[in-house]
Regions:
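Tandem repeat scaffolds
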Residues: 1-67
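Short, helix-capping/interhelical loops that line the mouth of catalytic, cofactor-
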Residues: 63-89, 137-185, 244-251
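Amphipathic, non-membrane alpha-helical segments in soluble helical-bundle scaffolds
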Residues: 83-94, 119-126, 174-181, 220-223
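Alpha-helical packing segments of well-folded alpha/beta enzyme cores
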Residues: 89-96, 100, 132, 173, ...
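Charge-dense, helix-prone N-terminal extensions
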Residues: 95, 105-107
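A preference for well-ordered globular domain cores
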Residues: 101-103, 117
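Short, contiguous alpha-helical
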Residues: 109-163, 186, 203-251
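Proline-centered turn/helix-capping motifs that create local helix->coil transitions or kinks
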Residues: 144-146, 192-201
């Protein structure tokens, strides 16, 4: 088998002509302006952003978007551009997450600390969403330079920053994490409830040490990032809960 070399620092990949790749898990890889000629894909799972991807002359992006929206009608509402749109999207997310949390409670508590296929556990997912809300709403929108809770969890590839918690070894209970989450959800809900059309056209700046450090960043984009994180991570959580439920039944 030909070895595949991935250089994540420059986000490039060197794959020799005629390479044969089997049983390989490729993560966090970006392909831009790439042509695959004579490609054979069999029993392949692709999860990620698909844009301007043509297969055998067909742009598959719109087809995938339409099918995902058909399967999940709420998905089309996760690209808000108006005050009412953000309010609707956040209400949907809180409703959906309530059902996911109820489902998680039916599992043994120790399984909520168990990742599936190297992904975050359910508890870690909630901790990361707490981090995202603190970063983009607490810090960027509300201007609190240090909005963190000790259980907040940045993404795995984050460089790390002084003063920002990053404890991958913590094992808090579901109720403990949800206690933080309720406060963060309320914070976002209150910001969105008070949102005005004028604010959606404004920019925000935070240059104090930490992350994010941005100047004149669109306020609407801060809110959209949180909406996007909440939507996608719930799908991942539901997928992994399915796997954990199956494992529990088999045992």
């Amino acid at each position: 088998m030909t070895r595949v070399v991935v250089m994540t620092a420059s986000i490039t990949a060197s794959i020799p002509r005629g390479a044969h790749v089997e049983h390989t898990d490729l993560r966090a890889i970006s392909f831009h302006h790439v042509r695959f000629l004579g490609l054979e894909l069999v029993d392949v799972e692709i999860t990620g952003a698909i844009e301007d991807v043509t297969i055998n002359g067909v742009d598959i992006g719109p087809l995938i978007e339409a099918e995902l929206n058909r399967r999940m009608p709420d998905r089309a509402r996760m690209h808000p551009t108006t005050v009412e749109g953000f309010q609707e999207a956040w209400a949907i997310l809180e409703r959906l997450w309530a059902g996911t949390e109820d489902r998680a409670r039916t599992l043994p508590p120790e399984l909520l600390h168990e990742g599936v296929r190297g992904e975050w556990s359910f508890i870690e997912t909630l901790r990361h969403l707490d981090f995202a809300s603190a970063a983009w709403v607490g810090r960027m929108v509300l201007g609190d330079p240090v909005p963190w809770h000790p259980l907040d969890l940045p993404w795995d590839e984050a460089p790390g920053w002084e003063g920002i918690p990053w404890d991958r070894e913590a094992r808090p209970s579901l109720d403990e994490v949800l206690g933080v989450r309720r406060k963060r959800q309320a914070m976002v809900r209150e910001v969105i409830a008070a949102l005005t059309p004028e604010q959606l056209d404004e920019t925000v700046t935070c240059t104090e040490p930490g992350w994010p450090q941005l100047e004149d960043f669109p306020l609407a984009q801060c809110l959209f990032i949180v909406v996007n994180e909440e939507w996608h991570h719930r799908l991942y959580a539901e997928r992994d809960l399915d796997a954990l439920v199956t494992t529990t039944k088999e045992n």
